[in-house]
A protein has these predicted regions:
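An acidic-aromatic substrate-binding cleft motif
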Residues: 91-162, 340-344
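Structured mid-domain segments that build the active-site/substrate or prosthetic-cofactor binding neighborhood
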Residues: 156, 161-166, 314-316, 322-438
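Catalytic domains of carbohydrate-active enzymes, especially glycoside hydrolases
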Residues: 143-173, 177, 184-186, 229, ...
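Hydrophobic or amphipathic alpha-helical targeting/insertion segments
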Residues: 64-100, 170-195, 201-226
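The substrate-binding groove and active-site-proximal loops of carbohydrate-active enzymes
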Residues: 67-70, 130-145, 158-166, 199-217, ...
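Contiguous, structured surface segment used for ligand recognition
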Residues: 1-119
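Hydrophobic faces of well-ordered beta-strands that scaffold small-molecule active sites
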Residues: 125-129, 162-165, 185-188, 234-236, ...
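Gly/Pro-rich turn-and-neighbor structural signature
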Residues: 36, 109, 168-169, 174-175, ...
């Protein structure tokens, strides 16, 4: 028997998890965008707890109800957004690509409709909202939080579960909103533990650990205390203020041995601080720029339980980034004998004071991105992907592309591109538009 979702549809949820409640309100909004007033009965959407794998869901029709089964918060959130996309036709980047909605009386569903999700190819999947110059002073509907809410919603619709919610001050302001929507929090590699930056708190002091160790300790403990009730993957590390090698701020460290020794010592200390408060905490550290070189050369030792995050060069190639005139282009993926958990920090947007594309598309072809990410997966780097999404709007195509990679482990480039264009721009000029992306 055929059913329909319309303005009379009710969403029934007997629990009160905040991320699920927010997703329910968003789907109600989607129904209002898609459906006009109607006197016809709409099927109810019912959320039921069921023993399933983490983040997974199943949708079935049952007696004029559309039932979502899941065992956890994100399972229900993903299930709700699946209905929004698959039945209502609301796309992941509906806000960012100005999707046009033509209202109808209802969205019809076969009585045989069923869908079962499958595990993602990558465990932790998310975005770093970085150099967000087009977002952080923008108001939508007179609400300063609304652009950020739209970022986090798009990420969830793409199957994300992790976010660095902004740069510097913004990361502190918006992490509670991100958590309320169901996302785990992690941190920029220049802001270990999500703590306030030393130069921000003490602008009159030289940011030297040797001179002010207690001040650094206090900042790290403050970061832990402010986030210990959230679901966090704690980033450990030690970079200079403003995202540079720490020895730029403290020139007494002139050898690789001394630099690696200090970084390893402080990473261990930060881990101990977190462990004292949260015994089952998860950790990560970025092997980025100078850090990767120290690690590769054996000068930096890391705890076994820390996810090692490898990085591209800022423009999609998995080699070390340039810093000034230093550009070694060392391959940035783990060797076969490098055990433990691994992740990547990958850029669809990059701003390094020498070159930038944070307000334009990535100046590379989809096949390069596909090739590099396939290489990442072939090296079994599947524990953690954080994608620098910057302002989101200029980068939606690649964000959608990578979402397919972290879900399925692969993507058909041409099929995805044509589907993306047809979904957002219509069927009339697919060939011409596709050339702009290739």
């Amino acid at each position: 028997m055929e059913m329909q979702i319309n303005v009379n549809t009710k969403i029934i949820y007997m629990d009160s998890a905040v991320p699920v409640m927010r997703a329910i309100e968003n789907v109600k909004r989607d129904i209002r965008k898609v459906c006009c007033d109607s006197d016809e009965k709409g099927c109810d959407i019912v959320l039921i707890m069921e023993n399933m794998q983490a983040e997974q869901f199943e949708i079935k029709c049952d007696n004029n109800m559309l039932v979502i089964y899941a065992s956890d918060t994100l399972g229900f959130v993903y299930g709700l957004y699946h209905i929004s996309r698959d039945i209502l036709g609301v796309l992941p980047f509906w806000f960012w690509n100005d999707q046009v909605f033509i209202k109808k009386k209802g969205c019809r569903i076969s009585g045989e409709y069923a869908y079962t999700s499958k595990p993602y190819a990558v465990k932790y999947r998310g975005w770093f909202v970085n150099d967000e110059v087009l977002i952080h002073k923008w108001y939508v509907d007179r609400k300063k939080d609304m652009p950020w809410e739209m970022v986090f919603e798009a990420l969830l619709r793409c199957g994300g579960n992790l976010v660095i919610p902004g740069t510097d001050k913004n990361s502190h302001i918006y992490r509670d909103l991100a958590a309320d929507m169901g996302l785990r929090i992690t941190h920029h590699h220049a802001e270990p533990l999500g703590a306030p930056m030393f130069a921000r708190r003490y602008p009159e002091l030289t940011p030297s650990y040797d001179e002010y160790p207690e001040k650094f300790h206090e900042l790290w403990k403050e970061g832990i205390d402010e986030q210990k009730k959230l679901d966090v993957i704690w980033n450990l590390g030690f970079r200079g203020q403003g995202d540079c090698p720490f020895w730029d701020n403290d020139p007494r460290y002139q050898t690789s041995e001394s630099r690696g020794e200090l970084m390893g010592k402080l990473i261990g200390l930060q881990r101990d601080y977190v462990q004292n408060e949260i015994p089952d905490a998860q950790y990560c550290t970025n092997l980025y720029g100078e850090t990767m070189e120290l690690y590769r050369d054996g000068y930096l030792k890391l705890p076994d339980d820390v996810i090692k995050i490898w990085a591209d060069n800022g423009f999609g190639k998995m080699v070390t980034r340039r810093q000034g005139n230093h550009n070694p282009r060392i391959p940035a993926l783990p060797k076969e004998n490098n055990t433990g958990r691994h992740g990547i920090y990958y850029h669809v947007s990059f701003y390094d004071l020498q070159a930038a594309n944070h307000i334009t598309m990535l100046p590379n072809k989809p096949k390069l991105v596909h090739s590099e990410l396939k290489k990442v997966l072939e090296h079994h780097v599947k524990d953690y992907w954080i994608i620098n999404c910057s302002n989101v709007k200029p980068h939606v195509y690649y964000l959608d592309f990578i979402a397919n990679m972290w879900r399925d482990g692969d993507v058909d480039i041409d099929k995805h591109l044509k589907g993306y264009i047809a979904s957002y721009y219509g069927e009339d000029h697919i060939t011409e538009i596709a050339e702009c992306f290739r």
